[in-house]
Amino acid sequence: MKQTSAVVASKVIAADKAAALALTPVSRETEQRLDRYVALLLEWQAKTNLVAPSTLPHLWTRHISDSLQLLDLAPDAKIWVDLGSGGGFPGVVLACALAERPGAEVHLVERIAKKAAFLREAIRVTGAPGIVHLSEIGDIVEKWSGGVDCVTARALAPLHQLIGFAEPLVKRGAKALFLKGQDVEAELTESTKYWKIEPKLYSSRTGGQGWIVAIDCIERHN
């Protein structure tokens, strides 16, 4: 008897999850929160394009592990701001993992109302310490009044634009962590036309051609 496509898909996702958690181990409680988040995302994906459909079979390694690896680069950070959170990567994933860190809080900034609604539901369902801001990025970072330890972004904009978004927060002591792809060197070269930065590059733990750009000092060129 042939397996149905649903059964095959379920086995593929289960294998991908196992591979992801081997790369980026989490507590049982965090795993349960992530399971609820993934179930919700798959439900909403049918009506709202939250991630590229082609990446769904590898959701755990492609998106969740990719997000979780940021935690090792800011192990003491409690207050995070995720710019352009979209489907919740890395923001919701980080919030799920940080739920066990006293005082932790992840601010999810999203300008599209439908995606912001999804993010709110994801935070509700998982019980993760997240706050959703329906806002343009520039509006909220310029008015930010609280402390920030880390600012993140993934699949949002070219690096030189991300640096501009993050500048007000980095100047106040935040560390910027940007998930980028194979064109990272070209993006860094372009960024130096506008900004004085001393970035650190980390190869993505998930393999492929992914990179993490870490920046803790930003100055504009005169």
From Swiss-Prot:
Primary location class: cytoplasm
Pfam families to which the protein is assigned, alphabetical: GidB
GO CC terms: cytosol
InterPro entries, sorted: rRNA_ssu_MeTfrase_G (IPR003682), SAM-dependent_MTases_sf (IPR029063)
Swiss-Prot/TrEMBL keywords: Cytoplasm, Methyltransferase, rRNA processing, S-adenosyl-L-methionine, Transferase
Entry's EC annotation: 2.1.1.170
Subcellular location field: Cytoplasm
GO MF, any single term: rRNA (guanine-N7-)-methyltransferase activity
Binding sites annotated in the UniProt record for S-adenosyl-L-methionine: G84, F89, V141, E142, R154
Reactions catalysed: guanosine(527) in 16S rRNA + S-adenosyl-L-methionine = N(7)-methylguanosine(527) in 16S rRNA + S-adenosyl-L-homocysteine
UniProt key word Manganese: no
Recorded family membership: Belongs to the methyltransferase superfamily. RNA methyltransferase RsmG family.
NCBIfam families named among the record's database cross-references: rsmG_gidB
Main function: Specifically methylates the N7 position of guanine in position 527 of 16S rRNA.
The protein's name: Ribosomal RNA small subunit methyltransferase G
Organism in which the protein naturally occurs: Bradyrhizobium sp. (strain BTAi1 / ATCC BAA-1182)
